[in-house]
Amino acid sequence: LADHWSGGKWSLRVEMKGDGLVKGMSRFSLQDPVTRNNTAEWLFLNNLRKENCMSVRYRFVNLVLNGKAMGIYAMEEHFSKEMIEANQRREGVIVNYDDYLLWKKFPEDMHSNIEWNSIFRSSLPDVRNNKRVNGSTDLTRQKYHAFSLLRLMQKSQCLASEIFSSEETGKFLALTRLWSAEKGLFYADINFYFNPITSKLEPIGFDGNPTRNSKAPYCYFTWGDIKDNWVNFALQ
């Protein structure tokens, strides 16, 4: 989106080769802190981790690019094995809903005309780091189990407590509301960790874009937003 390239601080996506890590991360983004509302995102994600909810790591760094000082950048972890380990969870898969129908089939200027309930129910499950997952029999089995949970949620064919880890999900949604960080709940942005011990999903904090305005434009708990009916399902 335009906020990642319109200014003087363009966003960068970094993937380390081999076993290389930077600050313990193998995959991360570097971007203007304004993109995630400056320190608000850092505070929100740290609050999640303090309450044992999953989130990506987020910190600020002084970036030098090809010898040029670029100033302070936000370093935002992307989904990886290291991210799971940093959250003190056992290795598992991270799944989400494919956003093809949203961005490829319907241009952004058509979004106001979309029937969001149909888009949500029609979106296909997807997995992060597919190559690594498919190289492991155990992770592949987890992937298909997690996919089945996502499909059950789309069809509302079971109880929310059978899909989500109730304590972590409840705290996650409560903190999201307290921080006005509902942007991260958008069905095309939310990612879930499949916990192989409980066989349930846990939401991952990412791109919440929290605001101090109590009437945040993403406040689904106040006026509802049908495109994010996974939230309505989880709140059951």
Where are these regions (language model features)?
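A conserved hydrophobic secondary-structure block that centers on an alpha-helix together
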Residues: 23-71, 144-168
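Sec-exported extracytoplasmic/periplasmic mature domains
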Residues: 48-53, 174-180
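ATP-dependent phospho-/nucleotidyl transfer catalytic cores
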Residues: 80-178
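Short, solvent-exposed loop/turn and secondary-structure capping segments
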Residues: 25, 73, 85-89, 185-191, ...
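A short glycine-rich, hydrophobically flanked beta-strand micro-motif that places a catalytic Asp/Glu
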Residues: 56-62, 186-193
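C-terminal catalytic region of ATP-dependent kinase domains
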Residues: 159, 180-181, 193-236
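Conserved oxyanion/phosphate-binding beta-strand-loop segments in alpha/beta enzyme cores
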Residues: 1-34
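Gly/Thr-rich phosphate-binding loop signature of adenosyl cofactor/nucleotide-binding cores
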Residues: 76
